[in-house]
Amino acid sequence: MGEAAEGSLRLVIADDHPLFRGALREAVLGRHADATIEEVGTFDELTALLERDRDFDLILLDLTMPGARGFSGLIYLRAQYTSLPVVVVSGNEESAVIRRCMDLGASGFIPKTMSVAAMREAVAGVLGGETFVPSDISLAARADAETDAIISRLATLTPQQVRVLMMLSEGRLNKQIAYELSVSEATVKAHVSAILQKLSVESRTQAVIAVSKVEAGLWSQSQA
């Protein structure tokens, strides 16, 4: 995606910390003074916003904001809005986490410890069609073959199937999922069957385990 024309840039900052949202806003406005910036503090607010209006140039996403667990928010956004770039912003700067975000389709990763000036350059690079990760991170070190295979299979899920899978991971029953998605239990069962087939597993439990392997060892500490 080419960089948006001056004055037409539209971004979403999705983070539950107002002070950090302010820092990101400053970083963006320092380069694009006329940018339109929407701010949300929960993942539910983000999805509601995008259901109303998906005409944005970039999403700046906090991995661990309320309503998102681990990589679930990123996985959902990449499935639902394939052409909308997502840059992850996080206090978890483990190299494995950064690489996994890129594996899952992020356009960049901005550590929360970066200066506003550095954030400004990172955002500008992504808007110019580049990817961004901290200079000391090598993307050459890949996940193991099994995890790579799971990530590839996750990419085949439809947006609704991703939502169902995330709810399964939270321990919800078909009845609860049906209520939340405003669909019938039969529809949920059909989604679950499709998920099992696409992930090459035989049970709901195995599907949840498959997702957990993507996150294994990466979230041992609670970090914003």
Residues of each region from the PLM?
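Recognition helix of helix-turn-helix DNA-binding domains
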Residues: G171-Q206
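Active-site beta3 strand of CheY-like receiver
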Residues: R54-L60
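Basic, Lys/Arg-enriched C-terminal extension of HTH/homeodomain DNA-binding domains
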Residues: L196-A224
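Active-site residues of response regulator receiver
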Residues: D62-L63, S90
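Short, flexible helix-to-coil linker/hinge segments that flank and couple to helix-turn-helix
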Residues: I98-D103, G108-P159, R163, K213-G217
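Acidic catalytic/metal-coordinating carboxylates
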Residues: T42, R69-S72
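Short amphipathic alpha-helix used as the core "switch/output" element in two-component signaling
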Residues: F71-S83
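The feature encodes the CheY-like receiver
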Residues: P66
